[in-house]
C-alpha cells in the first residue's frame, strides 16, 4: 500500500465534500444546518481528545477542570435561550435524549401514546425505533386529517382510557405545532408525563416563533442542537421539574452515554450566545422563507401539502411529487442538479412506501443562515420547476444552481471574534 496516495484520497474526499456541499449545492435537508465560523473554529480543540464521564465537578476522570467550566457555561446559556431551569447536554443526539427520558418514564411492557405517524412522529417514537428497543408499547393517537394534526378530542378519550406512562408530541415531518396546551392537563390527570420532541423546531422555539412546550405543560423538552438551532450535532434534555429531571440525568451515564463528545460544548455555548443576539431575527426569516417557498412552488403547479392551513408554520415544506415520478426519483433528480432534499412519507402514504414515498421534505433553515430571503425562495422554486417539470438539461441546471449558490457563501446571524491573538493552530473547515 502506498500510504501517501491513500492519505491523499482521504484528504481529497474531504475537500470535495466541503467544496460541494458548502459552496455548490442548495441544501434543503430539513434536519441539517451550518455552524458559524467561530463555532466551527472552537469545535477543533483539545476537547475532542478527552473524556469526562459523569457530571460537571463530579467526574470519574481527572483533567476535566476546563471541561467542567465550559459545560456549565453551555448549559447556562442553553437554559437562558430555552427559558428552562434544567439542562443536560450529554446526549449525543436527539434520539439518545429521547431514549434516556423514555427509559426513566416507563418499563418494558408499559404503554406510551405518540403523535400519529401522519402528523410526523419520529421513528424513535415507534416500535421500529427507540420505544421498540426499550420494549415500550407505542399507540398512535388519532389523526385529524383536516388540521393535519393530533385529533384532540379523540386523543383525550384515549389518554383517559389507556392511562399511558407518558405521551410524546413533536416529530420529523413537522409543519404545524402539536396541541401541547390542550393535551397537557389530561396527560397529567392520569399521572402520566408529557414529552415534547422539539428536535426539528428548537431553533424556532428559541427564536420565539414557535411556542415553548415547557410553558404549555410539557414535562420534558428533548432537542437536537443542529437543525433549526444551528449548532454542532448533538442532543439535549430540558425540564423545569427538578426531581423528574434528576431521575433522567442520573441515567444518561452510564446507561446511554459514556463520553459525550466534549468538543461540542464550546460550539454549543457559542451558538446559544448567537441565538441570544440573532435568534429571533433568524427564526422569523426562516418562517418567512418557508412560506415564500411553499407559495412559489404552488404557483408553479407543484402539489404543496397543507394549502388550506397556509402550507407551513415551521421551517419545512412538504410536496407531493407522485405525479413527477415519486419521492425517490425526484430527490435523486434534484441532487443531480445540486439541489439537496430528501424523499419523505406524506400523511396519506402507507408505512411500506418508505423507500419510494410520494413526497419530498424541504427545509429552508440552512440557506436562510447563508442569507437567502423570500426572493431567493422564488428563484429556487423556479429552478425546481425547470428541473422537474420542464426537464431542462441537467448539466445546464447544475450550473445555474451552482451560480446561485456562489452568491451566498457567508454565514449570517453569527458572532465574530479575532482568534489570531491567541496564535492558535486552528484547523480550517475548508481545506
UniProtKB/Swiss-Prot annotation:
Cell compartment(s), UniProt: Cytoplasm
Enzyme class: transferase
EC number: 2.1.2.-
Cross-referenced InterPro entries: PyrdxlP-dep_Trfase, PyrdxlP-dep_Trfase_major, PyrdxlP-dep_Trfase_small, Ser_HO-MeTrfase, Ser_HO-MeTrfase-like, SHMT-like_dom
Keyword Oxidoreductase: no
Keywords, sorted A to Z: Amino-acid biosynthesis, Cytoplasm, One-carbon metabolism, Pyridoxal phosphate, Transferase
Gene3D superfamilies: Aspartate Aminotransferase, domain 1 (3.90.1150.10), Type I PLP-dependent aspartate aminotransferase-like (Major domain) (3.40.640.10)
Single GO cellular component term: cytoplasm
GO molecular function, one term: pyridoxal phosphate binding
Record-marked site positions (Plays an important role in substrate specificity): 226
Cofactor(s) listed: pyridoxal 5'-phosphate
Residues engaged in binding (6S)-5,6,7,8-tetrahydrofolate: 121-123
GO biological process entries: glycine biosynthetic process from serine; tetrahydrofolate interconversion
PANTHER family: SERINE HYDROXYMETHYLTRANSFERASE (PTHR11680), SERINE HYDROXYMETHYLTRANSFERASE 1 (PTHR11680:SF35)
Function: Catalyzes the reversible interconversion of serine and glycine with a modified folate serving as the one-carbon carrier. Also exhibits a pteridine-independent aldolase activity toward beta-hydroxyamino acids, producing glycine and aldehydes, via a retro-aldol mechanism.
Family matches, as NCBIfam families: PRK00011.1
UniProt name for this protein: Serine hydroxymethyltransferase
Organism: Metallosphaera sedula (strain ATCC 51363 / DSM 5348 / JCM 9185 / NBRC 15509 / TH2)
Amino acid at each position: 500500500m502506498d500510504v501517501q496516495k491513500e492519505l491523499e484520497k482521504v484528504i481529497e474526499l474531504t475537500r470535495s465534500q466541503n467544496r460541494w456541499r458548502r459552496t455548490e449545492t442548495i441544501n434543503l435537508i430539513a434536519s441539517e444546518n451550518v455552524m458559524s465560523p467561530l463555532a466551527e473554529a472552537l469545535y477543533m480543540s483539545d476537547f475532542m481528545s478527552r473524556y469526562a464521564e459523569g457530571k460537571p465537578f463530579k467526574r470519574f476522570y481527572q483533567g476535566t477542570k476546563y471541561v467542567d467550566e465550559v459545560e456549565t457555561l453551555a448549559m447556562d446559556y442553553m437554559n437562558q435561550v430555552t427559558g428552562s431551569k434544567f439542562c443536560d447536554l450529554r446526549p449525543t443526539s436527539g434520539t439518545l435524549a429521547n431514549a434516556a427520558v423514555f427509559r426513566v418514564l416507563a418499563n418494558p411492557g408499559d404503554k406510551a401514546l405518540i403523535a400519529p405517524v401522519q402528523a410526523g412522529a419520529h421513528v424513535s417514537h415507534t416500535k421500529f425505533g427507540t420505544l421498540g428497543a426499550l420494549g415500550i408499547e407505542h399507540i398512535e393517537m388519532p389523526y385529524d386529517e383536516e388540521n393535519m394534526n393530533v385529533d384532540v378530542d379523540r386523543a383525550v378519550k384515549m389518554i383517559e382510557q389507556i392511562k399511558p406512562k407518558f405521551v410524546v408530541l413533536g416529530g420529523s415531518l413537522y409543519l404545524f405545532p402539536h396541541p401541547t396546551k390542550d393535551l397537557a392537563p389530561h396527560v397529567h390527570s392520569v399521572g402520566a408525563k408529557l414529552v415534547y420532541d422539539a428536535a426539528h423546531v428548537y431553533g424556532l422555539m428559541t427564536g420565539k416563533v414557535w411556542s415553548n412546550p415547557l410553558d404549555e405543560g410539557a414535562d420534558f423538552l428533548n432537542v437536537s442542537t443542529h437543525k433549526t438551532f444551528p449548532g454542532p450535532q448533538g442532543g439535549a434534555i430540558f425540564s423545569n421539574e427538578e426531581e423528574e429531571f434528576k431521575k433522567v440525568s442520573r441515567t444518561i451515564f452510564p446507561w446511554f452515554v459514556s463520553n459525550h463528545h466534549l468538543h461540542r460544548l464550546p460550539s454549543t455555548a457559542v451558538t446559544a450566545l448567537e441565538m441570544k443576539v440573532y435568534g429571533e431575527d433568524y427564526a422569523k426569516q426562516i418562517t418567512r422563507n418557508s412560506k415564500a417557498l411553499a407559495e412559489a412552488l404552488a404557483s408553479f403547479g407543484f402539489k404543496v401539502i397543507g394549502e388550506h392551513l397556509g402550507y407551513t408554520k415551521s421551517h419545512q415544506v412538504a410536496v407531493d411529487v407522485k405525479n413527477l415520478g415519486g419521492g425517490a426519483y425526484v430527490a435523486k433528480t434534484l441532487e443531480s442538479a445540486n439541489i439537496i432534499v430528501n424523499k419523505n412519507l406524506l400523511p396519506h402514504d402507507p408505512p411500506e412506501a418508505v423507500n419510494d414515498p410520494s413526497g419530498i421534505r424541504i427545509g429552508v433553515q440552512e440557506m436562510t443562515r447563508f442569507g437567502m430571503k423570500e426572493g431567493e425562495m422564488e428563484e429556487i422554486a423556479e429552478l425546481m420547476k425547470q428541473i422537474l417539470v420542464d426537464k431542462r438539461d441537467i448539466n445546464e441546471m447544475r450550473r445555474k444552481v451552482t451560480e446561485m449558490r456562489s452568491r451566498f457563501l457567508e454565514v449570517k446571524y453569527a458572532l465574530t471574534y479575532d482568534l489570531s491573538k491567541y496564535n492558535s493552530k486552528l484547523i480550517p473547515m475548508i481545506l
